[in-house]
Amino acid sequence: MFYFLGWFVMGIKGVGGSGHSDYPIPSHNGDGESEKNSSDSTSSKVNAKVTSSLQGAPSTNDENSVSPYSVVDVTDLIESGESSRHVIKKSIETEEAAHRESSVEGAGHSSRGIFGRLQAGLGRLARRVGEAVRNTVGSIFPQRAGAEQRTGKARTKYSPSASRGLRLMFTDFWRYRVLHRNPPMDGLFAKLDADEAEDMAAYTKEYVSNLEKRGAADRETIEHCQMVAKNWEKRARDLRDMGAAKKFLRDPFGKSDPKYKGTLPGEYTVGNTMFYDGPGVSKLSEVDTGFWLDMEKLSDAVLSANIQKGLRARFVLNQSIPQLESLEERFRKLESACDEARASLKEAGWIKEGKEPNKAQRAFRRFVEESRNLELSFGSFGESARRLSARVSQGLAAAGEAIRRCFDCRKGKYSLKKDLSSEELNLAEELIRFTDEMGIERDPDGNYNIPWVENWRTGVPVIEGEGAEHIYETMMPVQESFEQVYEVMDMGLEERRDFAVSQQHYQVPPRSSLNYETPRFREYDVPRNSARSYYDVPRVPPQNEVEEMHVTKGMRSSVYACFVAGMRNYIVSQPQEQIPNSEQVEQLFQELINDGDQIIQELMKIWNEELDNQ
């Protein structure tokens, strides 16, 4: 029986998850003859059925708790094999007794009778084993579509773990280790990967549930098999942790993994989290890459002053609209004068040798001078508009921060907080003035229909039309000290950018990008208070320590360190709406400490002892 099953297991050992075999299954029909000589034998039919069923595609069903499949029962095979063996042994003993009693008969006749009855016993054994194997194969492997059409039967469901479970269940583990209560995972089973260990755990669960349903084993055996399933789950978990820790140590930022793609230099994403490791990454938490200043560290009085400056700048910009219209009219007059001067020059000609300039030359020179004056006046107005836009930008950012400090948001509506200090009340009054000036309406309850705070905190005014990119590019803060304003007027584009970088107004753009596409600070959404947002990173063990550690002893401590580091990266780098608040983070860590503190301490102790012994 086991000899036959050994050949059968060797035949399907090359079966993987893809549903095909790497080498043909050897034939063995029970009496030592080849398949060619006994084409109608039971084992040849079984081999043909296995070969044909291996070509079917397995379905993907992950539910292992309640198995809908007809699970293979080893005890039935063993009992049928034992009973068949007893039948054969009894028939052989009967034949030997008959041979002793009828020793006077011819040797040829008696040998033919013994061989005939032995062959009949072997045939019965082959039929029983073939029936059991057919049931096994039918429950594990699906039939081909052609076989379905011939038989008209529906396709058998495919067990998710049976691809590897069937390969392993007839081996030493099931025969000698599980059933004999000695399940150390060494030898062949120490070489299994995490997926195979998970499959073994799933198959063991199915096997135990089948034993419980049929009542085929005592409670002690069932509990032992359940413990074996838990050991396989723990083994798979340890192997996955080991692989994750090794991958983390080899490539902590995930740059060599093709799943991590970055659109900008130094930018990459892990899942839905975006990281930045480009130029200026050390200053990413303190220098904002947008065109607005960080307002959270400013006092209420400074915020109020910024709001007032923004309101005044907006008022001046509104007053400047007629000037823009007059400039447009002057430009149109200038164009007509230019056309007239060009026409008169064409008629009179340009005489360089003339002692006195003629009328056309004088008209053209007057046009050139007027054009220069208008260009200078327009340029100074553009500079003023740039400074005013910057102040409006700072006023918007200050208003967003003031909204966060002084207002409560409920269902998208902002209402004034009740317990405010005197400075915060002054700031709130200034903010109410700001909302009235900006035309933000209030509902009958007194709540403001203000956009979300994050939209306000960006603080970049919307500028459309020609020159918008230039205004955005040259927008810079106004440096104020001792109530004096220092404004540098005559600056080129590079000087403006250097000045803005020196004022910590935006980050240095990489020289390789021609369009100055710098990553924005708000895209990565590190919390504004950088002093409190970064936690102490736990020590990650080096690669040699992880590789030399045993997976069941010291691995959990290093995985815990990697987990804390990854959790810290997750908290400080998620999008704003996905960042857990402090209560959620505290609850998460509290659960971790309550559930795993003792285990972690013990593992750290074991790990330290291992390090001391090395």
From Swiss-Prot:
Per UniProt, the ranges with Polar residues bias are: 49-68
What domain of life?
Answer: Bacteria
Residue numbers spanned by region Disordered: 23-68
Query: What family does the Swiss-Prot or TrEMBL record give for this protein?
Result: To C.trachomatis CT875.
Q: What protein name does the entry list?
A: Uncharacterized protein TC_0268
Task: State the organism's lineage.
Answer: Bacteria, Pseudomonadati, Chlamydiota, Chlamydiia, Chlamydiales
